[in-house]
Amino acid sequence: MNIHEYQGKEILRKYNVPVPRGIPAFSVDEALKAAETLGGPVWVVKAQIHAGGRGKGGGVKVAKSIDDVKTYASNILGMQLVTHQTGPEGKKVNRLLIEEGADIKKELYVSLVVDRVSQKVALMASSEGGMDIEEVAAHSPEKIHTLIIEPSVGLTDAEADDIARKIGVPDTSVAQARQALQGLYKAFYETDASLAEINPLILTGDGKVIALDAKFNFDSNALFRHPEIVAYRDLDEEDANEIEASKFDLAYISLDGNIGCLVNGAGLAMATMDTIKLFGGEPANFLDVGGGATTEKVTEAFKLMLSNKNVQAILVNIFGGIMRCDVIAEGVISASKAVHLTVPLVVRMKGTNEDLGKKMLADSGLPIISADTMEEAAQKVVAAAAGK
């Protein structure tokens, strides 16, 4: 689950990480009141969407008067903000953060992620803040410093000080940087976050260390422990299909391709998408129906896939272990009839009651394309999507 910048800063504030004074606003009038409450002479008007690159997309403006605040708030609220993370369709801006201006002397980068190799939390820091860390990694990898944190110990004073100095924090500000880094780690750990990022972490002209931005992602499987985090959820920022899928216990993620995928098991689903890509196709979604799929779940899965107007063909790839192939076949037949399927459908089933499932599909009278291997299924669905 993702949250907005201003919500991330609320979390940081609780963990004693210095952040600028700011007030969220949902209308132009609220933006003006926020600016008046904060006082001038400089404010920053920030679009609040779940995506990075807002500044380059015109979603962050520095205002030097109340009139500027009004103009920028009017322009940004309701706009369809397009960034490198939103895709060409962009995201509608429904809320703003009005924040006091900052005297930026230097921009730094810090983040915490789970390192899958060490199975521990990794702290990444760089002297190159204010830009995408991917760009830094590509062009100046030596400027990224990584520290694997021992969970039984946490981020020690010595480790925090060392990282701070490596990214260019002067000795007079190291203690402040230590406080920010340790606060960020504690926030990450205690909220079950999967990502915590401050970009940029700034040094001001008078030597203060301040988090000028905040990005948090949370492990959805741990949200039951954090009702205060769940309260931050903004459904307007989430994919409508993904919200609908969650109601039926379907793991669904929208993608940019034109081939719908219905698979049981996350590993097989990813392998299926890889194979489609291998043969020149583009998956339109990740969809794992799990091991307890019913006819209702399969029907809802078809509805989800077909709600994407880009879908030109569908691949159903099932391994019948816990899930029986005849149950899936029944669901596929029922779903195809219920949604009046008009796009090509390729089905590959292996495992429990495989022969019965295949017979049910063959006897259904539906124009279903059968395949025996994953490679064959991928080739056939790519060809079908291309109209061949």
From Swiss-Prot:
Superkingdom of origin: Bacteria
Keywords annotated in UniProt: ATP-binding, Ligase, Magnesium, Metal-binding, Nucleotide-binding, Tricarboxylic acid cycle
EC number assigned by the record: 6.2.1.5
Every ATP-grasp domain range: 9-244
SUPFAM superfamilies: Glutathione synthetase ATP-binding domain-like (SSF56059), Succinyl-CoA synthetase domains (SSF52210)
Pfam families referenced in this protein's UniProt entry, alphabetically: ATP-grasp_2, Ligase_CoA
Pathway assigned in UniProt: Carbohydrate metabolism; tricarboxylic acid cycle; succinate from succinyl-CoA (ligase route): step 1/1
Cofactor note: Binds 1 Mg(2+) ion per subunit.
Alphabetical list of InterPro entries matching this protein: ATP-grasp, ATP-grasp_succ-CoA_synth-type, ATP_grasp_subdomain_1, Succ-CoA_synthase_bsu_CS, SUCC_ACL_C, Succ_CoA_ligase-like_bsu, Succinyl-CoA_synth-like
GO cellular component, one term: cytosol
Essential cofactor(s): Mg(2+)
Reaction(s) catalysed by this chain's protein: succinate + ATP + CoA = succinyl-CoA + ADP + phosphate; GTP + succinate + CoA = succinyl-CoA + GDP + phosphate
Binding annotation for ATP: K46, G53, R54, G55, E99, A102, E107
Keyword Ligase attributed: yes
Gene Ontology molecular function terms on file: ATP binding; magnesium ion binding; succinate-CoA ligase (ADP-forming) activity; succinate-CoA ligase (GDP-forming) activity
Record: residues binding Mg(2+): N199, D213
Keyword Nucleotidyltransferase belongs to the record: no
Binding site for substrate: N264, G321, I322, M323
GO BP, one annotated term: succinyl-CoA metabolic process
Subunit structure: Heterotetramer of two alpha and two beta subunits.
Family named by the database record: Belongs to the succinate/malate CoA ligase beta subunit family.
Its biological purpose: Succinyl-CoA synthetase functions in the citric acid cycle (TCA), coupling the hydrolysis of succinyl-CoA to the synthesis of either ATP or GTP and thus represents the only step of substrate-level phosphorylation in the TCA. The beta subunit provides nucleotide specificity of the enzyme and binds the substrate succinate, while the binding sites for coenzyme A and phosphate are found in the alpha subunit.
This protein's name: Succinate--CoA ligase [ADP-forming] subunit beta
Taxonomic source organism: Cupriavidus necator (strain ATCC 17699 / DSM 428 / KCTC 22496 / NCIMB 10442 / H16 / Stanier 337)
Gene: sucC
